[in-house]
Amino acid sequence: MQPLVILTGPTAVGKTKLSIDLAKSINGEIISADSMQVYRHMDIGTAKITPEEMEGVTHYLVDEFEPDEEFNVVKFKDCAKEAIREIYSKGKVPIIVGGTGFYIQAVLKDIDFTENDSDTPYRKELEELAQTEGAIKLHDILKQCDPVAAEAIHPNNIKRTIRAIEYFKLTGEPISKHNEEQRGNESPYQYAYFVLNNDREILYENIDLRVDKMLDAGLVKEVLWLKEQGYDRSLVSMQGLGYKEIYAYLEGECSLEETVYLLKRDTRHFAKRQLTWFKREQDVIWLSKKDYNSDASILTEMVKILTEKEIIK
């Protein structure tokens, strides 16, 4: 089996710098598993890695799609597998880095999403329903047939909502049940799945600090520019953390003070959900920052584990 390294963890835990040091140490290249950093023009609110921070390490799936282009887990899996093949062809090690757990799982377990690309009459019916009665009505239908999928799929992601309803209609089985069964798949890779974590108080302090820095760096201007370019708040990209809150502020729905409070609160909730996801995953290696005196010592531990697992020589 071919090697694959995963480095994940909650937002603002400090994955970026460690991932660069890791890539340099093991002759690796990085595939971003971040559902937001894939979009161009959305830099500040996504805490996107800068070319300077990359330090010459090749990155995939950063700045590859426009904000109004569809990007989802199926597309991520296809793009990531293509990137993995390219990295292997160079004799290097692919490192998946990011906090979108479902994306990581899709590649690691080679999940079959049973995409049916041919249009069906039922799909057309659902698309018409979305146009006439709106995304929320469609999402309510999903809640009735598959509440677990409804929890995972944003109401504005109409295509995924339709696919989930359609899957239930065609098979009589919730797509969430199918995806859960796929979690038990054997991975086609020789892998190590690292989860970087920190004490909750420190993590939440880092989140608050990051939000303040984003605002100082011009997050409001960034969202205003996107709005002026015609990127509507109904887009999946514009529902990302930082963007939906600032968009609401620009629409006069809340004060800047309220917006900052909501953004910090929502980001903390997001970090909590990420950790819940990673705790459910199999074979993860937890790296708690409180157990190490520096990132260098964490890196040493990671390289040691990768050597023991014969992922690197």
Curated annotation (Swiss-Prot):
Chain positions recorded as substrate binding sites: T11, A12, V13, G14, K15, T16
Reaction equations catalysed: adenosine(37) in tRNA + dimethylallyl diphosphate = N(6)-dimethylallyladenosine(37) in tRNA + diphosphate
EC number: 2.5.1.75
Enzyme class at the top of the EC tree: transferase
Residue numbers binding ATP: G9, P10, T11, A12, V13, G14, K15, T16
Matching InterPro entries: Dimethylallyltransferase, IPT, P-loop_NTPase
Family in the record: Belongs to the IPP transferase family.
Protein name (record): tRNA dimethylallyltransferase
Natural source organism: Lachnoclostridium phytofermentans (strain ATCC 700394 / DSM 18823 / ISDg)
Lineage: Bacteria, Bacillati, Bacillota, Clostridia, Lachnospirales
